[in-house]
Amino acid sequence: GEPLPLDTCFILRAGTDVSLVSWGAMIADCLVAADALAEEGVSCEVIDVATLNLLDRTTILASVEKTGRAVIVEEAPRHVGFGAEIAALLAEQGLFSLRAPVRRVAGYDTIMPLPRLEKHYMPSSVDVATAARELMEFD
């Protein structure tokens, strides 16, 4: 196959209401949440950031300009995670595109637990869908 570019986000699902921005393991939960929200009439754009270094700011900003809402989803702790960097990007360069506050769905501010407890630590598709629904209340 072809090597993946290191500076490109991938739009896995096009949408018009909410941008779900994520990477790694949380992509699957974002896609599940997008399916559930579609049944409620909410159209989610799912963006796979893919590489955190050489961040594709253009794709993220264009998506949020289109949807006006962003949920950043990561499995890392909420504070000092890379999601905060994306939130800062939206505050600095995409503020006037936002119709609602940026929401971050992340792990707890603690160390990653043992595997048997991981499901209690990691955000879920339900958490992602809940955050997106809350953003839809802004208009």
Predicted regions and their residues:
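Thiamine diphosphate
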Residues: G1-D139
